Amino acid sequence: MSRVAQLDSIALDKELYGQFWSEFNAAFNTSEHKEEWELALNTVVFMCATRFLPHYGSSCTYGSALSGVVFQCRKRTLYVVTVLAGYVWKKITHIIFNGPHCGNQMMWLKLYKWVNLLYHGCDVTNFLRFLAAEGPNARAFLSPLYRAFNVHSTRLIRDGSAIASEFYSNSVFAGLEYQNRQLLWNALLELFSNTLLTKRGLLTFVKKPPRSRSTTTYKTVCPRCGGFPTNPYQIACCRANYCYVCVVKALEWSMCDACGSSGRLTASPVY
């Protein structure tokens, strides 16, 4: 079965729990006994999902039902690995890091770090085995905790045949369609930026109105930067003096800042 669907089921559950918790936390003061409040809320969400969703002989969460994935285990086992285990780990972490830093506490802290490192190593190994699992009889475990409790995920079966969640399929196709539109839009923007929106292509259609300064002013003031012309060049259309850098820009854009002329401009050094 699709490995992406199994991973998406976990991501959907985390997003659901996080959304409910953020709304609950904004409405009520949960500064005291925060972990217990979160456990109670996640338990209610889990019970509602497992009670009212169709199971077809298996256990499933809200996210797994949307992605067409079920778990071959009992509901209480699925509750332990999806909800209760996270609460227990948070409480252990809270006790170890917030306890008094005595001799026993430092020993527990070292043990915690070693257990955490060992779990992450097992998690990497389990993920590689999860990706390599093939065949209809292969068991896929989403984490070492799932493997320890023998909670493996399979495809949702109805009437003897595997079915795909319509919501999940539509979500995947909608995501692909959105990415295709983004690629097309980026290609159009790149086309415009390389053709119509270039300085030469755009400024040929835009003519600046003539400046009100007199010709004598442009002999001592660069019409582009407003400073004294450094290494001056005189443009042929109105004989205004430009700085060298400014006249290069004016010739590149084919637009005179002094008189608004456009087209094939030329300039020559004053001295």
Swiss-Prot record:
Q: So which stretches are on the Peroxisomal matrix side?
A: 1-2, 61-77, 134-175
Q: How does it sit in the membrane?
A: Multi-pass membrane protein
Report the sequence similarity comment from the record: Belongs to the pex2/pex10/pex12 family.
Q: Which reaction does it catalyse?
A: [E2 ubiquitin-conjugating enzyme]-S-ubiquitinyl-L-cysteine + [acceptor protein]-L-cysteine = [E2 ubiquitin-conjugating enzyme]-L-cysteine + [acceptor protein]-S-ubiquitinyl-L-cysteine
Localisation per UniProt entry = Peroxisome membrane
Kindly state one GO CC term assigned in the UniProt record.
peroxisomal membrane
Result of altering D257A:
Does not affect assembly of the PEX2-PEX10-PEX12 complex
* Quaternary structure annotation from Swiss-Prot or TrEMBL: Component of the PEX2-PEX10-PEX12 retrotranslocation channel, composed of PEX2, PEX10 and PEX12.
- Reported EC number(s) for this entry are 2.3.2.36
Q: Does the keyword Membrane apply?
A: yes
Domain of life where this protein originates? Eukaryota
List zinc finger spans: RING-type.
222-259
Q: What is its main location?
A: membrane
> Which residues does Zn(2+) 1 bind?
C222, C225, C243, C246
Alphabetized, the UniProt keywords read: Membrane, Metal-binding, Peroxisome, Protein transport, Transferase, Transmembrane, Transmembrane helix, Transport, Ubl conjugation pathway, Zinc, Zinc-finger
Protein name (Swiss-Prot/TrEMBL): Peroxisomal biogenesis factor 2
The further comment given in this record reads: Present with 339 molecules/cell in log phase SD medium.
Q: What free text does the record give on domains?
A: The three subunits of the retrotranslocation channel (PEX2, PEX10 and PEX12) coassemble in the membrane into a channel with an open 10 Angstrom pore. The RING-type zinc-fingers that catalyze PEX5 receptor ubiquitination are positioned above the pore on the cytosolic side of the complex.
Any one Gene Ontology BP term: protein import into peroxisome matrix
Q: Which residues cross the membrane?
A: 3-29, 34-60, 78-97, 102-133, 176-197
| Pathway given in the UniProt record | Protein modification; protein ubiquitination
Q: What does this protein do?
A: E3 ubiquitin-protein ligase component of a retrotranslocation channel required for peroxisome organization by mediating export of the PEX5 receptor from peroxisomes to the cytosol, thereby promoting PEX5 recycling. The retrotranslocation channel is composed of PEX2, PEX10 and PEX12; each subunit contributing transmembrane segments that coassemble into an open channel that specifically allows the passage of PEX5 through the peroxisomal membrane. PEX2 also regulates peroxisome organization by acting as a E3 ubiquitin-protein ligase.
The enzyme's first-digit EC class, named in words, is: transferase
Q: Where does Zn(2+) 2 bind?
A: C237, C238, C256, C259
The residue spans the entry assigns to the Cytoplasmic side of the membrane are as follows: 30-33, 98-101, 198-271
Q: Which organism is it from?
A: Saccharomyces cerevisiae (strain ATCC 204508 / S288c) (Baker's yeast)
